[in-house]
Amino acid sequence: MIAHKQKKAKKKRVWASGQLSAAITTSEMGLKSVSSNSIFDPEYIKELVNDIRKFSHVLLYLKEAILSDCFKEVIHIRLDELLHMSKHQNLNSVDLQNAAETLASKVKAVNFTEVNDENKNDLFREVFSSIETLAFTFGNILTNFLMGDVGNDSILRLPISRESKSFENISMDSVDLPHEKGNFSPIELDNLLLKNSDSIELALSYAKTWSKYTKNIVSWVEKKLNLELESTRNIVKLAEATRSSIGIQEFMPLQSLFTNALLNDIHSSHLLQQTIAALQANKFVQPLLGRKNEMEKQRKEIKELWKQQQNKLLETETALKKAKLLCMQRQDEYEKAKSSMFRAEEEQLSSSVGLGKNLNKLLEKRRRLEEEALQKVEEANEHYKVCVTNVEERRNDLENTKREILTQLRTLVFQCDLTLKAVTVNLFHMQQLQAASLANSLQSLCDSAKLYDPGQEYSEFVKATSSSELEEKVDGNVNKQIASSPQTSGYEPADSLEDVARLPDSCHKLEEDRCSNSADMTGPSFIRSWKFGMFSDSESTGGSSESRSLDSESISPGDFHRKLPRTPSSGTMSSADDLDEREPPSPSEAGPNSLGTFKKTLMSKAALTHKFRKLRSPTKCRDCEGIVMFPGVECEECLLVCHRKCLENLVIVCGHQKLQGKMHIFGAEFIQVAKKEPDGIPFVLKICASEIESRALCLQGIYRVCGNKIKTEKLCQALENGMHLVDISEFSSHDICDVLKLYLRQLPEPFILFRLYKEFIDLAKEIQHVNEEQEAKKDSPEDKKHPHVSIEINRILLRSKDLLRQLPASNFNSLHYLIVHLKRVVDHAEENKMNSKNLGVIFGPTLIRPRPTTAPVTISSLAEYSSQARVVEFLITYAQKIFDGSLQPQAGVIANTGAIAPQVDHGCHPKPLLSPDERDSDHSLKQLFFSSKEDIRTMDCESKTFELTTSFEESERKQNALGKCDAPILDNKVHLLFDQELESASHKTEDTCKSPKLLLLRSDRVANSVQRPTPRTRLRPVSLPVDRLLLLAGSPTERSSRNTGNTDSDKFGKNAAFEGLHRKDNSNTTCSKVNGFDQQNVQKSWDKQNERNSFTAKTTVIIPSAYAEKGLAVSTGNNRGHSSGAAQPSKAHADPARSARDTSEHSSSDSCPVAAVRAPRTLQPQHWTTFYKPPNPTFNVRGTEEKTAFPSAAVPPVLVHAPQSHVAKSDPDLEATLACPVQTSGQPKESSEEPGLPEGTPTCQRPRLKRMQQFEDLEDEIPQFV
């Protein structure tokens, strides 16, 4: 049924379209008659005047409606009356239609809710101007019509409306069908469709057909535009090649004309490309596709809505049918019950008296059944009525929905037609403009070609060749001009016998013609002398010189100096023709960047720093790592090789020296990269971190958002090829972050070594425990009244410092640099949304990970990820307290010859997080975090001296144990006396050693008045491996000696307060070998003297004045204690009940000697306790083991500073005298730490005091402060 109606509608549309075409034809025929005869018809003129007067009145009514504060509907009605003035089709032109559309858009754009007396003139200014424009346009069109100047192009070919009464359609009104006269209004269209039962399906099918139709149109336009675009590109290439070929050929007929034609082709092709781009963008394709997609979307929604409404109506109709059947069934049941009741009554009347009682019961039962049946009938009738009401409501709803859908579809179709009309006008209008410009240019070329006289150029050529008397003069002028021209200086002058001389006037004329006709030619402009017999057959027949090699010499065997000029590449030749290194570059090519023939090649910023030349031999490209054959270039300075096509993406800057080979960085051993840097920090870390800090600290999601994988791999490859010379400014910040994370992730062993993994995981658990305690206590009023840094946090800080000092110098410096960089990222967390917790999650598994194994992943190993993140978060949060802004130098930087390693580039060091003033203002808080391993380090190994220092450790510990009340007074006196002696001694050391001046680490002069805790001199037991027990049993200096070598001297200060505070352990440290002086010989002599000279508890040291005159500075202090002054040997296993927390607290409070100078060394435990095998002693070791022991408490502290030259020449008696006093109790022999191990030969062994245990117990009762 639907298909049949669609066929009928199609037949009607075909018939209507044929009638419309006939109407248009009749209209076109009538226009001529109107233009010729209607003007002289008095009746038509009278009617026209009346219509014009009515049009002016409508304009006035519209203006008055706007000025008289009418409602919006009134203004729109007036505007609608104005726009429907379409009676005279001869006056309905494009300009008038555009003016009317402009007026309508201006009126609709006014927001009438905001109109008042104040802003009325401003809001309606554009409307009034549009009304005046419409009136002016109408007047012009009317004048042209009356004057007979109306053109057919300006008249719109619109369908003739019912109101259009003119001579060409009067006869047609009598034959048109009633329902086909003119255009229907939108309401009439909807009413017509409502009469049809299948109106929704017809409208939806039309919308679907419109979508398919539009799809085909868009497909045709897109394919056509693509073909035209490809054609224009080929035309441009062909025109460029042809123009460059015919441009060098002179005296050719119509040469300028064809050159202009080629230029016109190029210009028109460029215009066509712009037109195609516009049509593909917002002029045709995109708007039409958008409208089609919207049509499809709304059509599907409308279809779904219509199906839902139909299903609802079907459900209600089904319910109505069921209700009707139920009513009929109930009625039948009621009739049966009623007849049964009637029979029962009859039986009762005819029955005897004895059966009356039973019949009464039966009668009552049947009466009850009859009533129930009647009740069911009434209920069924009520349900039926409800169903009937529901069906009526559904039908009304369906009718309303049908009307709304038809209105929506009609509006949608109108909008789609409007869009299709607009884009179609754009399409043909732009094509018309393109064709018009092309037609004009072709017409001008045709006119120019008609003016050419055949043989004109040949005559000019003959005249030029026959003027032999002026050959030398012209040849000299030409050669002079060639030599002076900067664009042709690369070409040698031709021989005079082969040159074709021309007259000066013809020369100038030719030069002017070439400049005017070939102004846009690419390549050098030059004056070329003709040579006879120099054309090959292929050139003369083919018409192009591209088939020959433009780099080759002349074809003539006798012409060794002439070279053909090189034409630029047209896209079809090899790109190697521009790389002729046999020709010296011209002055114009030898610019500041020395681009030469690469001016047309796209280059990156890094590529512009190179000075390229043609590649001499095949090799590998540094950019893409492909094989470079002939189309390759090579830098003259750094010898970088790459393809020409890779110059656009090159990121390696010229280093003006030979570029190093490729270095495998990602996945390589860390020490391989670190040993090539002065400070041990990989250049990848420094480059990436500095670039991120310069432009991406406020970038949201830094280090969290992933970058482009291809660009990241490109940057990794460039860093391996160019190392420090890579310019990473062209890459995005996320790509740089990915490179940094990838480098850290691919390290075989992270910055925090595998052997320290367990300690850091335990540290993370302590951090978690402390955080939980702080969370529980942060709301208590006591903490709010007395805010202070938790002692547990301070202890964790000191333990973390102790663990970090066990890292090698390069690992420590790299970790230091990275953590400080991440701290700066966290400082901008408000902008980048990356706090320390987020960064800990990202960098935790990268910086701290266990040794890889083949064991399967367990839940415990997964749970350690949070611990890894927590440690990194803690390091970032307390970076100011853990790292102090300076880096450790690498170990082993001094060679056997005493040469000093290159200085560390301080520009690469992390910037200090606080200024000195801020440090001083915050000094009261940071005093709690001083650690001997952090604040006291050795000086540079290139110093020419060593210092032998002692301390008041035993006396201070005795004072703290005997009386806490006298501790501050004694401490102040001892420190004041000792500081004065140290200052005088250190000044002498400066003069002797000529070492760099030491800077102040802190400048707090009131530190002497603060009571300082006494550090322990013994170790508490802890559950660690044997080698770690040996490491912890030694002094802090001994534990960290392998990590510290020559350190930047700017880190240390001479503040007397802190020197007195930290001088509690003294040790003898020397460089292994400086200026040929071997420290091991002195150590052996000291050991021998130690064996012979064993001092008791009351031994004193007497140094003659003769030795002081030789350069020894002696400072003697008074010892105030005698009862328990003996040194206490270290007992690693003395008290197994002590906890690991006390152990870490004790080890963190150990101290080191101040400014002790020695070479870095490696701790070598006894070989029978571990698997470690001690290496053979060489002169390259960082230092020898120090075997020190403390004398009795009665010995006054002695500070000796002696130059190496004096020590080397000192007497044996002096060595014997200095042997034992310089040994400290804080550094006992390793063999004495393990009671169960074989004992070596001890040096200056002392008996254990009887009251040792008492002092230890008393010391435990004294509160310890960090």
Curated annotation (Swiss-Prot):
Transmembrane segments: none
Interaction with PTPN13/PTPL1: annotated span: 1263-1266
Gene Ontology molecular functions: GTPase activator activity; PDZ domain binding; zinc ion binding
Residue numbers of Phosphoserine PTMs: S166, S171, S174, S185, S496, S516, S549, S915, S951, S1023, S1149, S1151
Residues covered by region (Disordered): 538-596, 1033-1054, 1114-1153, 1222-1248
Coiled coil: 291-413
InterPro entries hit by this protein: AH/BAR_dom_sf (IPR027267), C1-like_sf (IPR046349), F_BAR (IPR031160), GMIP/FCHO2-like_FCH (IPR054713), PE/DAG-bd (IPR002219), RHG29_45_N (IPR057028), Rho_GTPase_activation_prot (IPR008936), RhoGAP (IPR051025)
Site feature: Arginine finger: R704
Domain named Rho-GAP: residues: 668-883
Compositionally skewed regions (Low complexity) per UniProt: 538-556
GO cellular component: cytoplasm; protein-containing complex
Biological process terms in GO annotation: negative regulation of small GTPase mediated signal transduction; signal transduction
Domain F-BAR, residue spans: 187-457
Compositionally biased region (Polar residues): 1115-1127
PROSITE patterns the UniProt entry points to: F_BAR, RHOGAP, ZF_DAG_PE_1, ZF_DAG_PE_2
Domain of life according to the entry: Eukaryota
Any Pfam family matching the protein: GMIP-like_FCH
Subunit structure: Interacts with PTPN13/PTPL1. Interacts with RAP2A via its coiled coil domain. Interacts with RASIP1.
Role, per record: GTPase activator for the Rho-type GTPases by converting them to an inactive GDP-bound state. Has strong activity toward RHOA, and weaker activity toward RAC1 and CDC42. May act as a specific effector of RAP2A to regulate Rho. In concert with RASIP1, suppresses RhoA signaling and dampens ROCK and MYH9 activities in endothelial cells and plays an essential role in blood vessel tubulogenesis.
UniProt name for this protein: Rho GTPase-activating protein 29
Lineage: Eukaryota, Metazoa, Chordata, Craniata, Vertebrata
